[in-house]
């Protein structure tokens, strides 16, 4: 039973959520046996592939490198995954915008059900995932020959990014599907920890009354604690902070060691 993890990366390095996805794959490995492979699909992505090869527990890295994969267009990544999909019992991706865009396409092409945002592995075919906005946990069993899974990063502790010694193998890249084109990307640069991986989060809600109060009250505290800043949906809708601050069901899923909520009801 070999498991393929689709790496989320920026062509130069592996994003932290990939380590959580590999952790889930290693639990699958423990209950069913087999190897863990990682696919890096990008352009000029040798550095990312080399970083993936160092991840603890990974036995092989598949590198698909071509211009049509540079920006992670889902149609091209999915087609490349399909070139190797039949060799795997499980295809795993982190439940990020990237993973959620690719995994359903792979599942549709394989004519199997996708299992979304798992937080625990019970056996090789049985998983747990949150439902009803996290108020209940569903146990899901799949009889499909290939399980296509997205992993909620907060459900699994990340594996070590160093210590592995996997081989890197270049694979055939599918031709450009020509169904979409990359237009632009706006990257938000923060001096603080990223919300989804932060150990400490200071979050504000509508009770703060204004964006000015949010800045005045919360930023000094976050500075002292070296914390990430978050916000409720109500605070975002009121215009206190940008959308990428939003925490929760319709925002970012977080699992800090300390969460300080100010002016948030419910």
What are these regions (language model features)?
Residues 1-266:
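N-terminal glycine-rich FAD/FM-binding segment characteristic of electron-transfer flavoproteins
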């Amino acid at each position: 039973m070999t498991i393929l993890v689709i790496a989320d990366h920026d062509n130069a390095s592996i994003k932290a959520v990939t380590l959580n996805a590999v952790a889930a794959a290693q639990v699958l490995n423990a209950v069913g046996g087999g190897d863990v492979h990682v696919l890096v699909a990008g352009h000029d992505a040798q550095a990312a592939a080399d970083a993936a090869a160092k991840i603890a527990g990974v036995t092989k890295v598949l590198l698909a490198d071509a211009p049509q994969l540079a920006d992670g267009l889902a149609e091209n990544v999915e087609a490349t995954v399909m070139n190797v999909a039949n060799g795997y019992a499980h295809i795993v991706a982190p439940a990020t915008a990237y993973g959620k865009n690719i995994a359903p396409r792979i599942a549709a092409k394989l004519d199997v059900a996708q299992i979304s945002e798992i937080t625990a592995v019970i056996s090789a075919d049985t998983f747990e995932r949150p439902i009803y906005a996290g108020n209940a946990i569903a146990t899901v069993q799949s009889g499909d020959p290939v399980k296509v899974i997205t992993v909620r990063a907060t459900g699994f502790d990340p594996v070590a990014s160093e210590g592995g010694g996997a081989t890197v193998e270049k694979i055939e890249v599918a031709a450009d599907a020509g169904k979409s084109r990359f237009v632009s990307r706006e990257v938000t640069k923060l001096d603080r920890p990223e919300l989804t991986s932060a150990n400490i989060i200071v979050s504000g809600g509508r009770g703060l009354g204004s964006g000015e109060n949010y800045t005045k009250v919360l930023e000094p505290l976050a500075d002292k604690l070296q914390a990430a800043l978050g916000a409720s949906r109500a605070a975002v809708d009121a215009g206190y902070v940008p959308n990428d601050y939003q925490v929760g069901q319709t925002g970012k899923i977080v699992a800090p060691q300390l969460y300080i909520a100010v002016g948030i009801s419910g």
